[in-house]
């Protein structure tokens, strides 16, 4: 089965934008529901909204890269680095802190997107 070369950017871009919206869009509402902790300080709200901005910015770049051939390689490389880095962090957390029921599915998806992007970089040099 051959997957389209650009689909990984489109899918991961949409997922990361949605994750960013969960982190930063009304963190005082979403964080207790999703992650079981309260956001009670201005600093924590600011940090979560900054994370939202990073996620939304990189997600938009990946979506642009999925449509614009000129940006495909840079977007795919940034996707591989992001997914590889976040996977590495979650693996370290799993080893030191234990298995997270909430984030294990995210870890699996991040590893899959990392491998898919790496594969695309290796075998699609003509883009």
Please name every model-derived segment.
Residues 20-21, 62-63, 88-92, 115:
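Alpha-helical transmembrane segments of multipass membrane proteins
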Residues 43-64, 81-85:
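Core segments of alpha-helical transmembrane spans in multipass integral membrane proteins
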Residues 15-46, 52:
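Hydrophobic transmembrane helix segments
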Residues 60-74:
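Juxtamembrane helix-break-helix junctions at the cytosolic face
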Residues 1-16:
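Cytosolic juxtamembrane helix and N-cap/initiation of the first transmembrane helix
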Residues 80, 88-104, 122-123:
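Membrane-helix boundary connector in multi-pass membrane proteins
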Residues 112-127:
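Membrane-water interface at the C-terminal end of transmembrane alpha helices
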Residues 38-39, 99-109:
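Non-cytosolic membrane-interface motifs at loop->transmembrane helix junctions
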């Amino acid at each position: 089965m051959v997957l389209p070369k650009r689909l990984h950017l489109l899918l991961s871009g949409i997922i990361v934008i949605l994750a960013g919206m969960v982190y930063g869009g009304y963190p005082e509402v979403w964080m207790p529901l999703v992650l079981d902790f309260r956001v009670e300080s201005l600093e924590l709200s600011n940090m979560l909204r900054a994370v939202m901005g990073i996620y939304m910015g990189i997600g938009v770049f990946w979506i642009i890269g999925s449509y614009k051939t000129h940006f495909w390689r840079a977007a795919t490389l940034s996707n591989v680095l992001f997914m590889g880095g976040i996977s590495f962090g979650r693996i370290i957390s799993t080893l030191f802190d234990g298995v997270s029921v909430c984030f294990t599915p995210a870890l699996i998806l991040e590893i899959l997107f990392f491998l898919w992007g790496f594969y695309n970089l290796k075998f699609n040099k003509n883009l």
